[in-house]
Structure formats: structure tokens, C-alpha cells
Swiss-Prot record:
UniProt KW keywords: Cytoplasm, Endonuclease, Hydrolase, Manganese, Metal-binding, Nuclease
Subcellular location: Cytoplasm
Organism: Pseudomonas savastanoi pv. phaseolicola (strain 1448A / Race 6) (Pseudomonas syringae pv. phaseolicola (strain 1448A / Race 6))
Biological process annotations from GO: DNA replication, removal of RNA primer; mismatch repair
InterPro entries, A to Z: RNase_HII, RNase_HII/HIII, RNase_HII/HIII_dom, RNaseH-like_sf, RNaseH_sf
EC number: 3.1.26.4
Residue span(s) of domain RNase H type-2: 17-206
Protein name, entry field: Ribonuclease HII
Function: Endonuclease that specifically degrades the RNA of RNA-DNA hybrids.
Amino acid sequence: MRSPIMQTGLDFTLVEDLVAGVDEVGRGPLCGAVVTAAVILDPARPILGLNDSKKLTEARREKLYVEIQEKALCWFIARAEVEEIDQLNILHATMLAMKRAVEGLSITPKLALIDGNRCPQLSVPSAPVVKGDSRVPAIAAASILAKVSRDREMAAFELIYPGYGIGGHKGYPTPVHLEALARLGPTPIHRRSFAPVRAAHEARASIMIGGSIPLPVGLLQD
């Protein structure tokens, strides 16, 4: 008999007492924090429509975001900041943020199911689930909490750092973002350890040293 984790589609036999689903959003972007969430669903209060957050419309994610927070036994949203990403690298920063999410739960889970192929070091048993956000309801719920939280933050950064299109691409290396990065230089929320940001930073620093053009205030902060 196949393990329920290996079955295709969301498997609601995995909505068990004290099983936490954990997911992240924001490993690939050039700016902003990596955001994680951990969720323990309540078997007595099912949530219809759970799925990988990337497969849902923004409006549907927003509705489920509220419903998950209302119906889950517990949930916690955590993060690793840009400075931690640059210091640790994105993989280790993601593992740290996942650990913070699990440790932040008000109820200690019996098991943590982690989206992906590796687990952070936790004080509770854990197991990775490849494509877990499409297969395990609690991981799907975690993916929704993490994505909505991060997307809202990116929308706020659009107002603070206009001209980069952050509210649209959410920090991912789209042509619009890369062009703005080359033209305007990195902001304090850009990840200096990522090659496109580092290249833009070095190019703007070189121009500043050469005295060719004035730079916008605050764009070359470390």
C-alpha cells in the first residue's frame, strides 16, 4: 500500500491532530525577506479550496488567508531578513526561517511536514515532502499564509522604493526589475549576495567614485 504522502493530489488523511505543515515564499527574489509559515489544521474544521498558493488567484488567496487563521488550531508566520540572507546564504536563511515558524507555534506539533526536499533542524520529528504544497493540506495552508504576507509587504515597498515595480514582480528577477536595478541601483532591501544585485551595486559604486553622475540618496546603503 502506498504511503499517503506519495499519493497524487491533496490527501486529507494527512489532516491529523498536531501535524504541522511548513512552507516558504521568497527564495528566488532579489529583494526582501524570505517568509515562512507553519500551520496545524483542525480536522474538525475543514477548509475547502486549499492548494499550492501559486495556483490560486490573489483574491482566493486573500480569502483563504483569513479562513486559515480563523480555523487552524494554530499558525505562525516567520521570516529571515535580507541581512541574514546575505550573511548565511539563501538556503540556510530559509531553514532558519522555517525553524522560527515551527518554534513560534502555540502548540507543539507531533510531526512537521516540510515542503521541498530537506528539513531544518527542529526539536520535533520532521519529514520533507516534494511538492508538498500541492499534496498536503497543512503545507498548502502554510504556503498561502507565507505568500499573502510577503506579497503585502512587497506592495508596501512599492511605495517606499518607487521605480522598481516591486509591487508587481514581488522582487523576482524580471526584465523590468533588472532594468530598474541597473538604472537606479540597489535599495537597502536588495540582497547584496545575489549576483545581479552585487553587479548593480558595484557598477553604481564605480560611477560614484568616478564622479560621473550623482546618485539618488540612500540607494547605495549597505
